[in-house]
Amino acid sequence: MDIKINDITLGNNLPFVLFGGINVLESLDSTLQTCAHYVEVTRKLGIPYIFKASFDKANRSSIHSYRGVGLEEGLKIFEKVKAEFGIPVITDVHEPHQCQPVAEVCDVIQLPAFLARQTDLVAAMAETGNVINIKKPQFLSPSQMKNIVEKFHEADNGKLILCERGSSFGYDNLVVDILGFGVMKQTCGNLPVIFDVTHSLQTRDAGSAASGGRRAQALDLALAGMATRLAGLFLESHPDPKLAKCDGPSALPLHLLEDFLIRIKALDDLIKSQPILTIE
């Protein structure tokens, strides 16, 4: 099943779409500079592109951690991104009252993994009629995503994307079950599946409120996931990850974006140049 996002068509058998940007909005200038680089690289490589960022990181481990610029300022920044670059935007919501104002500006609304079973939030998101990106919770099996999908269908919104972001593996660690991509496709009507590689690289350090990360393994993990014929890749970057206000250890250094995407596109082109081989 393919999904339209403005002039972009997203599907598991189509050339991959990049959902890329920064973890959280830090300022207007840094957002526009980062987005400009993404736009330049993706246009050069011929990759459909959707900008992503959060206006509020409502689930930070510490109450003292940076959360973002807030809803009102965030929507102003997203409007400027769309006006300057003419690209779609995706952001996440955390409470039902945020859904409609976000839907008026952003093209895709994201359901956070930790909130994916919250029925009131699902219903409010569905009512907007926007395309919805469902993050798979770390505690949920791929096949159980069908229950979340069914909630959206019951609320009359079938414009859905499924997003893998890793599964809990014991304490303080995430792993990605590569077989899970196929399971989500099979159990959820072949909805577009995308891979959030940078969040899948998160770790937790004992005694620390901040997330660690393994960005050195980002390319290996991204290639492994994209080899399963996915609709898109979800990627966060930062001009200087050491200075990022959230999830810097998992962020791809922005200057490596082009070389990173060249390799992803080469694999995606190869995989999708071949007919699907069904093994029963």
Swiss-Prot record:
Subcellular location: Cytoplasm
Keywords, ordered alphabetically: Cytoplasm, Lipopolysaccharide biosynthesis, Transferase
Main location: cytoplasm
Transmembrane among keywords: no
GO CC terms in record: cytoplasm
Molecular function in Gene Ontology: 3-deoxy-8-phosphooctulonate synthase activity
Record's keyword annotation contains Plastid: no
InterPro entries tied to this protein: Aldolase_TIM, DAHP1/KDSA, KDO8P_synthase
EC number: 2.5.1.55
Highest taxon, organism lineage: Bacteria
One annotated GO biological process: keto-3-deoxy-D-manno-octulosonic acid biosynthetic process
Catalytic function, reaction form: D-arabinose 5-phosphate + phosphoenolpyruvate + H2O = 3-deoxy-alpha-D-manno-2-octulosonate-8-phosphate + phosphate
Pathway(s) annotated for this protein in UniProt: Carbohydrate biosynthesis; 3-deoxy-D-manno-octulosonate biosynthesis; 3-deoxy-D-manno-octulosonate from D-ribulose 5-phosphate: step 2/3; Bacterial outer membrane biogenesis; lipopolysaccharide biosynthesis
PANTHER family named among the record's database cross-references: PHOSPHO-2-DEHYDRO-3-DEOXYHEPTONATE ALDOLASE
Family recorded in the similarity comment: Belongs to the KdsA family.
HAMAP family assigned to the protein according to its UniProt record, in alphabetical order: KDO8P_synth
Protein name: 2-dehydro-3-deoxyphosphooctonate aldolase
Protein's gene: kdsA
